[in-house]
């Protein structure tokens, strides 16, 4: 029964990830695409956690942390690009 619930949850997460990919492709504005990319990162973390529970292993926990860090850095970089038009500033006024 528990395995069935995990498989259903994996299916739901896969469908929502697919819908977010459509939002990234068709998104009317760039901020919509950024939010969809962030949600894809969160879904990947959840899918990895569900697979880890399903396989009864803790081997994927490092991958979950890595995906979380990369998703956070990507969101910050996109936000900075939307705000200033560049990610890394060459001219800094000190």
From Swiss-Prot:
Parts of the chain that traverse the membrane: 2-22, 34-54, 59-79
Keyword terms of this UniProt record: Antiport, Cell membrane, Hydrogen ion transport, Ion transport, Membrane, Sodium, Sodium transport, Transmembrane, Transmembrane helix, Transport
Organism whose genome encodes this protein: Bacillus subtilis (strain 168)
GO cellular component terms given for this protein: plasma membrane
Pfam families, per the entry: MrpF_PhaF
Family: Belongs to the CPA3 antiporters (TC 2.A.63) subunit F family.
Signal peptide as annotated in the record: none
Domain of life of the organism encoding this protein: Bacteria
Subunit structure: Forms a heterooligomeric complex that consists of seven subunits: MrpA, MrpB, MrpC, MrpD, MrpE, MrpF and MrpG.
Subcellular location as annotated: Cell membrane
Family matches, as InterPro entries: MrpF/PhaF-like
Name of the protein described by the UniProt record: Na(+)/H(+) antiporter subunit F
Protein's job: Mrp complex is a Na(+)/H(+) antiporter that is considered to be the major Na(+) excretion system in B.subtilis. Has a major role in Na(+) resistance and a minor role in Na(+)- and K(+)-dependent pH homeostasis as compared to TetB. MrpA may be the actual Na(+)/H(+) antiporter, although the six other Mrp proteins are all required for Na(+)/H(+) antiport activity and Na(+) resistance. MrpA is required for initiation of sporulation when external Na(+) concentration increases. Also transports Li(+) but not K(+), Ca(2+) or Mg(2+). Involved in cholate and Na(+) efflux activities, which may be mechanistically coupled. Does not require other Mrp proteins for its own function.
One annotated GO biological process: sodium ion export across plasma membrane
Membrane topology field: Multi-pass membrane protein
Further information: Mrp-dependent antiport apparently occurs by a secondary, proton motive force-dependent mechanism, but the similarity of several Mrp proteins to membrane-embedded subunits of energy-coupled NADH dehydrogenase complexes raises the possibility that there is a capacity for electron transport that could provide a primary energy coupling option for Mrp functions.
